[in-house]
Amino acid sequence: MEGPPPSKRPCGLPPGVRLVVPAAAAASASNAATAAAAAAPAGAGAGASKPARPSAAARPAKGTPAASAATTATGADASAPPPDPGAPTWDAFAAEFDVAPSWRALLEPEIAKPYARLLLAEYRGRCLTEEVLPAREDVFAWTRLTAPEDVKVVIIGQDPYHGPGQAHGLAFSVRRGVPIPPSLANIFAAVRATYPTLPAPAHGCLEAWARRGVLLLNTTLTVRRGVPGSHAPLGWARLVRAVVQRLCETRPKLVFMLWGAHAQKACAPDPRRHKVLTFSHPSPLARTPFRTCPHFGEANAYLVQTGRAPVDWSVD
């Protein structure tokens, strides 16, 4: 907002002292004004025409105080870049990725940030030049299968499977009809070690777990086909971390299963508010065999202890 108009008193004169203009100077100024009026073309009365635009040489240099004052007076600098169009609306984002409305409160504040706009722009650019997995409508499939208020267990993965037809938006899960990957086979073995009466899964689709309150979330949501880790530089991890943090703040007493160093570094829930379980990664290359992981029984024990129903770890 503009401040009060500057004082009419010439700079450097104390209050009460008037500037006296010599009579000769005043007369000279009056004669000059009369001559200028006489030289004006006929019909150029007050308000008849706009004052001429000063030449480029007469205009103040850009960046000087005079230029700043001129910009303020006119309201804008004609050479300034156009304003930032801003973040995408929630409706546009949700429509593009088929995001469930239940996650709006956790996702909307994040997608409005500059880094998220750059992330989404880079993702769209990659889609034009390479085969990106999973399909666009499955990148946020986890939001459609598990509402925030239903989350009991959070399992953190790294990035999607990079083989054709495998990834569909849930960590460690593959579509029906796709061979069960070795890591998922080890997960199933650990489940059956704790619950031996469960039938052996005939497929690797974990949508049933997701519908029962198990959030299966990768830290990187996309990948280039055949190139594991290729989309980690896009910045998905920052978005996922922020969403998990908001989930931790709004949902107490969650169970976190953090398998391997990557998951344990990417996600750091408060152990005073949540049950945090750590183990080696289920990959067959891990030093500690994952088949001995007791997390599935420990998670259910904690859920029962805190007054909630245990998770059914069977796969439909």
Curated annotation (Swiss-Prot):
Belongs to the uracil-DNA glycosylase (UDG) superfamily. UNG family. Excises uracil residues from the DNA which can arise as a result of misincorporation of dUMP residues by DNA polymerase or deamination of cytosines. Therefore may reduce deleterious uracil incorporation into the viral genome, particularly in terminally differentiated cells which lack DNA repair enzymes. Residues 36-91 are annotated as: Disordered. The keyword Iron does not apply. One of its GO terms (molecular function) is uracil DNA N-glycosylase activity. Keywords: DNA damage, DNA repair, Host nucleus, Hydrolase. It is an enzyme of class 3 (hydrolase). One of its GO terms (biological process) is base-excision repair, AP site formation via deaminated base removal. It comes from the Viruses. SMART domains: UDG (SM00986), UreE_C (SM00987). PROSITE patterns: U_DNA_GLYCOSYLASE. The gene is UL2. Disulfide bonds: none annotated. It is found in: Host nucleus. InterPro entries: UDG_fam1 (IPR002043), Ura-DNA_Glyclase_AS (IPR018085), Uracil-DNA_glycosylase-like (IPR005122), Uracil-DNA_glycosylase-like_sf (IPR036895). Residues 36-79 have a biased composition (Low complexity). It catalyses: Hydrolyzes single-stranded DNA or mismatched double-stranded DNA and polynucleotides, releasing free uracil. The active site is at 159 (proton acceptor). This is Uracil-DNA glycosylase. Its EC number is 3.2.2.27. GO terms for cellular component: host cell nucleus.
